[in-house]
């Protein structure tokens, strides 16, 4: 018991040091490399038989869970980040998921547009369709589709009041009359309306039971309609965001709630009770890795302005520094993780479904 307590205390002390900005970027990268190797050692099995059994067991375990856990304090803070901060860290469209980097010279703004164009191409968007964007955030994809396909009616769903207000304000500025934003939790949303195309980008990560989620969404897919899903993944194995061991500072610091899932690239193929896979792609982890690097650079280049924004928003210098450090470590750790083995471990999966 004494050893266990000592390890827990060591992690708690490390997190305090991180929060106080006492751990250098290089130390964070080094610690993340160790964490990544531990996760790979945990995830990879000696035989393919064991590897497949692990994934199938994990997929089956999800089927016994609720669709999603209640949004907790951390998630609420992530949804209600001060908008001026997002304008600094993210690109012009405020896309809060990875962009597509054609090469290292691609700018963050370009990467956001390239990725959303890829979504539209792979989801087979055509003018005149009805589009549903689940968990639309600040409307990057909703507004992109609405501008590019003026004949489309685009509906976005968000559970954030500030996000809805921002999107509707952008619609006025862009003279868009083909956008509707519904303020609702996706897991509680009900409608008899069906849509030609449905997007679920960076949403699956917040779900537990993919079967229940896809069953619900399938009722909103029109005849001959399609559902496009993008999610973060490891190429082979899946896991809950729970501490790997007692030395796991990363999960304790970045995802203390334990409500997220890191799925595998193929896991959604095991959930075809109500939808059928039409196509499936993966994108290298280089894309999110480069995106996190760009976020970090923009944050650091504007650090004084960020301090002012956070002090005003959170009410104290101490809390401002805590959140600045959190976002810096978030970017450093994930840039490191997604770059592992040249982007061939953690990556992005995109799946196109049709209704059964």
UniProtKB/Swiss-Prot annotation:
Primary enzyme class: transferase
Q: Which Pfam families match?
A: CMAS
Control of this protein's activity is summarized as: In the presence of a racemic mixture of tetrahydropapaverine (THP), one molecule of (S)-THP binds in a productive mode, while one molecule of (R)-THP is bound next to it in a non-productive mode. The (R)-THP seems to inhibit the release of products from the enzyme when higher concentrations of the racemic substrate are added to the reaction.
Intracellular or extracellular location(s):
Cytoplasm
The entry's (S)-tetrahydropapaverine-binding residues are 205
Q: In which pathway is this protein known to take part? A: Alkaloid biosynthesis
Q: Does the keyword Manganese apply?
A: no
**GO cellular component terms, A-Z:** cytoplasm
Family annotation (CDD domains) = AdoMet_MTases (cd02440)
The residues that the entry says bind S-adenosyl-L-homocysteine are: 96-97, 135, 159, 163, 185-186, 201
EC numbers, comma separated? 2.1.1.300
Give me the residues that bind S-adenosyl-L-methionine, please. 96-97, 135, 159, 163, 185-186, 201
Keyword match Transferase = yes
Please give the positions of the paired cysteines in each disulfide bond: none
Q: Which residues form the active site?
A: 331
Q: Which UniProt keywords apply?
A: Cytoplasm, Methyltransferase, S-adenosyl-L-methionine, Transferase
According to the UniProt record, what happens if one changes residue 206 to A?
Strongly decreased catalytic activity. Over 90% decreased catalytic activity
Q: What induces or represses this gene? A: Not induced by elicitor treatment.
How does this protein assemble? Answer: Homodimer.
The molecule here is called Pavine N-methyltransferase
Q: Which species expresses this protein natively? A: Thalictrum flavum subsp. glaucum (Yellow meadow rue)
Q: Which gene encodes it?
A: PavNMT
């Amino acid at each position: 018991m004494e050893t266990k307590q000592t390890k827990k205390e060591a992690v708690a002390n490390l997190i305090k040091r991180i929060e106080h900005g006492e751990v250098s970027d290089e130390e964070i990268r080094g610690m993340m490399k160790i964490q990544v190797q531990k996760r790979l050692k945990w995830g990879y099995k000696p035989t393919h038989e064991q590897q497949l059994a692990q994934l199938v067991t994990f997929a089956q375990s999800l089927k016994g869970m609720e669709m999603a856990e209640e949004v907790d304090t951390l998630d609420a803070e992530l949804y209600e980040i001060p908008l001026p901060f997002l304008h600094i860290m993210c690109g012009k469209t405020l896309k809060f998921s990875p962009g597509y980097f054609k090469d290292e010279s691609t700018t963050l703004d370009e990467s956001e547009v390239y990725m959303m164009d890829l979504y539209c191409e792979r989801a087979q968007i055509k003018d005149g369709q009805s589009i549903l964007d689940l968990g639309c955030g600040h409307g990057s994809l909703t507004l992109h589709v609405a501008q590019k396909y003026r004949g489309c009616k685009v509906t976005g769903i968000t559970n954030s009041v500030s996000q809805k207000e921002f999107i509707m304000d952008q619609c006025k500025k862009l003279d868009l009359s083909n956008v509707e934003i519904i303020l609702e939790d996706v897991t509680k949303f009900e409608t008899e309306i069906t849509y030609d195309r449905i997007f679920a980008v960076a949403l699956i990560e917040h779900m537990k039971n993919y079967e229940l989620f896809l069953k619900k969404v399938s009722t909103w897919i029109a005849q001959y309609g399609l559902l496009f899903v993008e999610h973060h993944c490891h190429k082979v194995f899946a896991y809950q965001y729970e501490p790997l061991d007692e030395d796991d500072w990363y999960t304790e610091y970045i995802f203390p709630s334990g409500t997220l899932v890191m799925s595998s690239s193929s896991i959604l193929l095991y959930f075809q009770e109500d939808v059928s896979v039409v196509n499936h792609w993966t994108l290298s982890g280089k894309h999110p890795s480069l995106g996190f690097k760009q976020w970090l650079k923009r944050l650091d280049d504007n650090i004084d302005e960020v301090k002012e924004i956070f002090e005003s928003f959170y009410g104290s210098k101490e809390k401002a520094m805590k959140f600045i450090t959190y976002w810096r470590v978030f970017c450093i750790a994930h840039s490191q993780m997604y770059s592992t083995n040249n982007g061939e471990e953690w990556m992005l999966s995109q799946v196109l479904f049709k209704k059964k």
